[in-house]
A protein has these predicted regions:
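Phosphate-ester processing/binding pockets and catalytic centers
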Residues: 1-197
């Protein structure tokens, strides 16, 4: 079973990063080693510049795959942008083989809406038997640091985007005027996918 970890940033419009991991134990050891004594988790917003470089370099060397879902400021509300990004994530999971555990960083203000959306999206995509999803706090699941690092790096552009490029497989522009921002068709066969493992 692969695990896909999801986090958002609103710094430069609405962006969600999804990082897929197959060997969670090996990657968790690497992330745990990056957490400083006294820290509960890695959160790029609170890290010093030198540490950020170390963290991003470590991520770029990991055996993981990242996708950025960039809704920018194309939606009237953050919730609408989030729903569109979750739609794209479910489409991508539906297009690949195997089972997936989707772990979303918990934001209490959107958990209820997420659960409602995911319930519908997963069923529409026809993958209820291949996916489980849950929300967790970043300090309870160390691997939620991965999408935080990717999202943080993506919105800062330049050097930071270059640093994450070894693991970045796709950047999806999520746009209400384009087909990919809509809910998946019942067959679950839609364009755009995560690389097959």
């Amino acid at each position: 079973m692969s695990h896909t970890f999801v986090d958002e940033t609103k710094r430069a419009g609405y962006v969600i990063a999804a990082v897929t991991v197959t060997d969670t134990e090996a990657i968790r050891k690497v992330v745990r080693a990056l957490v400083l004594p006294g820290q509960r988790r890695i959160h790029m917003k609170h890290e010093q510049a030198r540490r950020r470089r170390v963290i991003v370099s470590a991520l770029a060397a990991m055996q993981v795959q990242a996708i950025v879902y960039d809704a920018a400021r194309r939606y009237r509300t953050d919730l609408a942008a989030r729903t569109a990004c979750l739609t794209a994530i479910v489409e991508d999971i539906a297009a690949r083989d195997g089972d997936t555990r989707l772990v979303i960083e918990q934001d209490d203000s959107v958990v209820r809406a997420d659960r409602h959306d995911l319930f519908q999206l997963v069923r529409q995509a026809g993958i209820t038997d291949r996916i489980e999803y849950r929300h967790q706090r970043a300090y309870d699941e160390l691997l939620l640091a991965l999408p935080d690092i990717v999202a943080w790096s993506w919105v800062r552009s330049g050097e930071w985007r270059r640093r994450i490029s070894p693991i970045l497989t796709t950047v999806r522009t999520v746009d209400p005027r384009k087909r990919e921002a809509r809910a998946p068709r019942p067959s679950g066969r839609v364009s755009g996918s995560l690389p097959r493992s």
